[in-house]
Regions:
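Hydrophobic alpha-helical
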Residues: 85-102, 170, 188-251
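Flexible loop/turn connectors
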Residues: 235-299
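Periplasmic-binding protein-like
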Residues: 28-29, 79-87, 106-110, 152-153, ...
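Structural motif
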Residues: 57-79, 184-206, 220-222
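Hinge/cleft segment of the Venus flytrap/periplasmic-binding protein
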Residues: 158, 173-174, 271-337
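Extracytoplasmic "Venus flytrap"
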Residues: 25-44, 48, 52, 56-69, ...
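Flexible loop/hinge segments that line or gate small-molecule binding clefts
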Residues: 91-133, 144, 156, 245-253, ...
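Hydrophobic alpha-helical segments within soluble ligand-binding/sensing domains
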Residues: 68, 125-151, 194-196, 243-248, ...
């Protein structure tokens, strides 16, 4: 009888010990599609989550509005402790903000250029690069390097808010500088073959341009190959691009892409996690934060410097850069001490 009593006591102690353990946090991430930029953003988020011991549920919307709404509601129904959304359309973040607020789930929004901060429902933070500054920087470079030459522009997805902000700034700066003219704007949809198709159509339709800006280097790499095959690359068509992707860096080194801007989606995902985690763990209580990651031109002087041309893939330099640019996150992870 005494043995049974002790067994019951031990069992109760074990049950209490298990229930007293801190609950493992679970975050949700809604990603817009399968493209490299989005995958790297997710990888950065997951890397930080692994360091923090947080579980993450990732749901892909595959550029489908209804699927995106379903993904948001799925995470809400799961009762996740926090949520991040990277949307391909302007309405997605506002829907996520509304649904998350109703459920009391903290929300971080990636690459919405801060628009969601104006929503009635509060969000923790909007994480962005300065797309306006990027557009103006590219316009200034083209004006300085190739005055009087016409420009064709291959966008990512024209419904994507960062594309719209970049393009508006680019058009305004080109007009302000008065040295170049934009003769065509086409939607490459972030699909390399589609970008090639659009460039081919522009050339065969007789558009007069010698400068081609392509919204990411994945599309630019495909266009480079196509132009090379027709002896048109730098003869006379010059390419500028953006993002500082690994394959883009190599094309810049060989002169196939003349200019680009570094913006690492991997590090962006890492910072998105820290913004969410800081709020969920009560380290940072502020809401409606607009957090901008730094951008830098990719030049011969910066191309081999990871602190300037920030890697897309998981890299220890993210830790150093976070300590430098975002000291508010010190102590959130063991590596940030």
């Amino acid at each position: 009888m005494k043995g049974i009593r002790w067994s019951v006591i031990i069992l109760l102690i074990l049950i209490f010990a298990v229930t007293a353990l801190p609950k493992k946090l679970v975050y949700g991430y809604v990603t817009p599609g399968p493209d490299t930029w989005y995958r790297k953003d997710v990888e950065g988020f997951l890397y930080a989550a692994e360091l923090a011991g947080v579980e993450v549920v990732v749901l892909n919307s595959d550029y489908d509005v209804e699927k995106e709404i379903s993904n948001i509601k799925t995470l809400v129904d799961m009762g996740v402790d926090g949520m991040c959304i990277f949307s391909f359309n302007p309405n997605g973040p506002f829907i996520a903000a509304r649904e998350a607020a109703k459920a009391g789930i903290p929300l971080v929004v990636t690459d919405n250029v801060g628009q969601v901060l104006e929503a009635e429902d509060p969000v923790v933070a909007a994480i962005d690069f300065d797309w306006d500054a990027m557009g103006r920087d590219i316009a200034q470079y083209i004006a300085n390097q190739w005055p009087e030459e016409n420009i064709a522009f291959i966008a990512g997805r024209l419904e994507h808010v960062p594309v719209q902000v970049f393009l508006k700034a680019f058009e305004e700066e080109v007009k302000k500088l008065g040295k170049n003219k934009i003769v065509a704007i086409r939607d490459g949809k972030y699909i390399p073959d589609e970008a090639v198709k659009q460039v081919q159509d522009l050339i065969e339709s007789g558009y007069d341009f010698t400068v081609l800006h392509i919204f990411n280097e994945e599309m630019a790499a495909a266009v480079v190959r196509w132009l090379k095959s027709r002896n048109l690359l730098n003869n006379p068509i010059k390419i500028t691009s953006q993002n500082g992707a690994p394959y883009g860096i190599e094309l810049i080194k060989e002169g196939s892409i003349k200019y680009s801007i570094s913006s690492s989606p991997g590090w962006e995902g890492f910072i998105s996690f820290l913004a969410l985690h800081g709020y969920v763990t009560d380290k940072i209580k502020k809401e409606r934060q607009w957090i901008l990651l730094p951008i830098t031109p990719v030049t011969k002087e910066t191309i081999n410097d990871k602190t300037k041309v920030v890697p897309w893939d998981v890299d220890p330099v993210w830790i150093d850069l976070t300590k430098k640019y975002f000291p508010q996150y010190m102590g959130l992870l063991d590596v940030l001490k």
